[in-house]
Amino acid sequence: MHALMRLFSDYTLQNVVLGTLFLGLGSGLVGSFAVLRRQSLFGDAVSHATLPGIVIAFLLTGTKSTEILLLGAALSGLVGTVVMLMVMRTTKIDTDGAQGIVLGVFLGFGFLLLTHVQKSPQAAKAGLNKFILGQAATILQRDVLLIIAMEVVIGLLVLLFWKELKLSTFDRDFSAVQGFSPQLMEFMLTALIVVAVVVGVQAVGVILMSALLTAPAVAARQWTNSLRVLCALAALFGGVSGVSGSVVSAQVPRLSTGPVIVLVLTGIALVSIMLGPQRGVLYQLWRRRRVSLLQEEG
């Protein structure tokens, strides 16, 4: 107990835990709607699309200020989103295809730029590699405040437009009849996903950020059919994984926080898939076995 208290008294760990806690809460919440809308790959595409913006922001300004780099990430993510929409509306390529194109092209371009930076005299002070898999230990107090502020905004917007988001997610036509704009809700959800991705890339990285959006919702879906409960569970799973991953990585030297958070989330998702009521693998096996026995007795 004393060792745990001493661990949490560490200033760096306090920042990391608070940052990843709120990041997990917000990502789990907004990711629930993305999963229900079958847009899981969208978060993946946006997170990968942020990499070129991060590198370009550094090349243009010569600074590795978190605010500047995240601004570049946000602009690049928005460009990637616009490209996806244009591809879907002007070609016969479906949603998954458009998202896959953006994911591959932007990630490849980002790595090309990153290679260029690493070969330049500025490479030693760039520190851009941390955005690939994340480096939560570099989070400062101002970064934590930014994460908290953005995740609180996400939570408030979801609460404020709960009815509209719910209707547009499950029945777009009925939502339009009720006077709500499905397109507006889709735009808002897209913006929230971009915000969640941008504030999370420093801690989790562009490669793994999509897992923080989808895994909590996938795990929560195994336990409930209620949207309200699903969102609450997804936020809880995201927050727990953030705190757990931060503590574990702090205890083990040279262990990156982002991958550990994703591993914890993967464990939660696997347990949920196996043990979830009604949907769980074990429940389905037990149900089939029971039906088989009843048929044999009959």
From Swiss-Prot:
Membrane-crossing segments per the record: 16-36, 41-61, 68-88, 97-117, 144-164, 187-207, 229-249, 255-275
Bilayer topology term: Multi-pass membrane protein
Cellular location(s): Cell membrane
CDD domains: TM_ABC_iron-siderophores_like (cd06550)
SUPFAM superfamilies: ABC transporter involved in vitamin B12 uptake, BtuC
Main localization, broad class: membrane
A GO BP entry: zinc ion transport
Cellular component, GO, one term: ATP-binding cassette (ABC) transporter complex
Domain of life: Bacteria
InterPro entries: ABC_BtuC-like (IPR037294), ABC_TroCD (IPR001626)
Keyword set, alphabetical order: Cell membrane, Ion transport, Membrane, Transmembrane, Transmembrane helix, Transport, Zinc, Zinc transport
Function per UniProt: Part of an ATP-driven transport system TroABCD for zinc.
Similarity section: Belongs to the ABC-3 integral membrane protein family.
Protein name: Zinc transport system membrane protein TroC
Organism of provenance: Treponema pallidum (strain Nichols)
Lineage of the organism: Bacteria, Pseudomonadati, Spirochaetota, Spirochaetia, Spirochaetales
